[in-house]
Structure formats: C-alpha cells, structure tokens
C-alpha cells in the first residue's frame, strides 16, 4: 500500500508529493560522492564524552524520523528542495524498516536523547548507500559528530562487504562542502533521485 502525503509546495497549492511535476519543482543540482572502501585506512573518529553510537531498530523509528526530518527542515540550505527531500525520506524510512530489508540504521545519542542518525543501504547495486546521509540536529553541529557518523557509516558498509560506497546530495549542502570530501570522497554530477518509494 502506497501512502500519499499532502503538503504545501512552493507554488502554494496542496498536492501529493508523489505527483510532483516539473512546474512544482525547482531545479536542484545534485552531486554524487563515492568512496573506495577497500582503499580507505582503518576508520575511526573519537566522540566527545557522553556521546555514543548505537544501532537503531523499528522501536526507534518515530524518534529516528523526527531527528532526520528536523535536521533537514532546520537547515536552510535544503529550503529549495525540502518537499522532494520529505518525499524521499518517507520512502527511505519505509523501506529500511521493512522486515525483509537489510537496511542499517545508526543512532547518535547524547545521553538518552537521539541527536543524529544515518541510514545505510548495504546493497552493492544501490546508487545511494547513505540515505539520507549523516544527519545531526542543528544545535549539535560543528562538533565532529557528523564526521563520526560518516566514519561509522563507511565502516559499516565496508563490514557488510561493499568495496565502494556512494552518497547523493545537493551541491550546496553542508555535507557536500565540508563532510563528504573527507576520507577521499570523489564528487561527480548526480542524477535527480526518485521522489516516491
């Protein structure tokens, strides 16, 4: 069963996200970063005290969704693509938590509070293994936490048997400027991601 989500798009009308047409979408420049996982050195990133990474499961889904959605909504660089991103997020999260899927969810916590997350697709044929990529709440950014999430994401993908990982993002997003170039991330033009699950 496909869930249809209604919301306001840039023109002010309400329409299902799954039916976005070019008249309702701004042109977004996407880029793809790739990492040769088997050529990376041993990956590690120290977290500050009281921060830790855990696996997330279906019981964490509501909190995970909230953290990922807030990290995008509060980041003004995503304003021109927020409706497309919301549609993609719903599809990614739905597929990740399906019982037969092998998605990996990482939760970054400060004490008991989830403050960051990363969803991984360990399928070698996937075009985007970091969906939607390391997400950290705005008030916790610029502390090395996104780097720690990226390191653990790449480490988990390598442990799952992938030799190469890819991530798709907007060309002007903070991850494209500051995070993904780390660890020898190579940038190339990206395709527009699918909008529905």
What are the roles of these predicted feature ranges?
Residues 1, 136, 142-159, 178-182:
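Conserved acetyl-CoA-binding loop-helix of GNAT-fold acetyltransferases
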């Amino acid at each position: 069963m496909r869930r249809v989500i209604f919301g306001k798009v840039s023109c002010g009308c309400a329409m299902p996200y799954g039916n976005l047409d070019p008249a309702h979408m701004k042109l977004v420049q996407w880029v793809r970063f790739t990492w040769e996982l088997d050529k990376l050195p041993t990956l590690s990133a120290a977290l500050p005290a009281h921060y830790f990474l855990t696996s997330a499961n279906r019981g964490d889904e509501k909190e995970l969704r909230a953290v990922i959605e807030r990290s995008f909504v509060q980041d003004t660089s995503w304003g021109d693509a927020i409706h497309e991103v919301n549609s993609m997020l719903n599809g990614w999260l739905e597929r990740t938590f399906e019982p037969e899927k092998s998605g990996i969810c990482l939760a970054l916590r400060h004490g008991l509070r989830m403050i960051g997350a990363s969803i991984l697709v360990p399928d070698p044929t996937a075009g985007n293994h970091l969906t939607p990529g390391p997400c950290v709440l705005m008030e916790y950014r610029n502390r090395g936490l996104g780097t720690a999430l990226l390191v653990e994401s790449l480490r988990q993908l390598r442990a799952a048997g992938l030799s190469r990982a890819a991530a798709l993002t907007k060309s002007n997003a903070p991850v494209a400027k500051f995070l993904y170039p780390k660890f020898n991330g190579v940038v190339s033009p990206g395709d527009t991601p699918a909008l529905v699950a």
